[in-house]
Structures are given as structure tokens and as C-alpha cells.
Regions:
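Anionic group-transfer/hydrolysis microenvironments
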Residues: 95-96, 187, 198
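Conserved small/polar residues in nucleotide/adenosyl-binding loops
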Residues: 192-199
Length: 199
């Protein structure tokens, strides 16, 4: 019996995860949807059933799940992914938390296979995923010495708050997700900056 959890199920990426699970008809026997306390109690329709979104707690993360899809931010992932892992789950995390960790696989399925040195798998951000798939083809065919790559990220990368800032910024409302108005603007960040000024 396959038990699957989606963490951040009411967020922008979490809802897309559910859409993809449905569209690809991914098999599982039990589904549990988690969110923050703020969104707990919401109801989500999925494959003809109504699921009540539950608050993610240490106790719930210590239950056995086979697979956990996480998209709830780096802090949530840092705290809860190891708990899910310790309880036996394979955790696929969409946050930036584990991307630079040496003992965590950073996976794009079309490019590399997981080694499963740990039960946590990180995925790169969206622009990296889209670039490495064709770059892998070029690398295999011709070899690459260097790639210079610049991206401009959508506000949706900041989740619902980022989209809200853009929509409400048109009318001059002060931003919540960004330090400056994003409407008619470009900001050099997509998340919080690290000490190396990466985001």
C-alpha cells in the first residue's frame, strides 16, 4: 500500500503537484495533504474525493509515508524533511533548502539518476531544470566547456504572495513579498539571499 503526502498542498506549486499527479495518473493508495496552520482545514477536491488539509506537525511528519512531495519553503523543509526521511519516506523537495547539500541528490530525471545516499531528493529551480535537459543532449553529442546563463524569474516563483504583489501593485498597493514594488520593476532576487549573495 503506497502512502503519499503533499506538503504545501494549498500553495501555488502544491496545487500544480496535485494536478500533475492527476494528469499522469500516478498510482497510490492513500493521500494526505499538509499545509501550515493558516491553511489547515481547507478542503481540496482530488480525483472525485474531498480531502481536508492537515497542519504539518512533528508527530505527523514522524508517521510512515512512502513518498512525500514538499513545496513549503526552505525553513519547513529543513525542519520536516529529515523527520519524514527518518520515518522511511523518500522526500522530493522543491525548495532551495537541499540544493547545495553534498549528501543530497539534486535530480532532473531526464539528466541524472538518484543515488539514494539519503532519502531526500532535491530538485533544481524551474529555470535550471528547463536548461539542463537540452544542455545534456548537447553535452552528450558535442561536449560543453562552459555555459553562461542568465534568467529572469517570474513572480510566481515567490508563490501566491508574489503574484498578489504584482496584481495589487498595478493599483499602487505596497508589496508584501518583496522589499520594493514589483509592478514595472525588476528585482535581483527570487528568494532570500544567502551569505554568498545567491538567491
Amino acid at each position: 500500500m503506497t502512502k503519499l503526502a503533499v506538503v504545501g498542498a494549498t500553495g501555488l506549486v502544491g496545487t500544480k503537484m496535485l494536478e500533475t499527479l492527476n494528469r499522469k495518473n500516478i498510482p497510490f493508495d492513500e493521500l494526505v495533504l499538509f499545509s501550515s496552520a493558516r491553511s489547515a482545514g481547507q478542503e481540496v477536491e482530488f480525483q472525485g474525493k474531498t480531502y481536508t488539509v492537515q497542519e504539518l506537525t512533528d508527530a505527523r511528519a514522524s508517521e510512515h509515508f512512502d513518498y512525500v512531495l514538499m513545496s513549503a519553503g526552505g525553513g519547513t523543509s529543513e525542519h520536516f524533511a529529515p523527520l519524514f526521511e527518518k520515518a522511511g519516506a523518500i522526500v522530493i523537495d522543491n525548495s532551495s533548502q537541499w540544493r547545495m547539500a553534498e549528501d543530497i541528490d539534486l535530480i532532473v530525471p531526464e539528466v541524472n539518476e538518484p543515488t539514494f545516499t539519503r532519502g531526500i531528493i532535491a530538485n533544481p529551480n524551474c529555470s535550471t531544470i528547463q536548461s539542463v535537459v537540452p544542455l545534456k543532449v548537447l553535452q552528450d553529442a558535442y561536449g560543453l566547456k562552459r555555459v553562461a546563463y542568465t534568467t529572469y524569474q517570474a513572480v510566481s516563483g515567490s508563490g501566491m504572495k508574489g503574484k498578489k504583489d504584482l496584481a495589487e501593485g498595478i493599483n499602487g498597493k505596497a508589496p508584501e513579498a518583496y522589499p520594493h514594488p514589483i509592478y514595472n520593476n525588476v528585482l535581483p532576487r527570487s528568494e532570500e539571499h544567502t551569505s554568498e549573495l545567491q538567491s
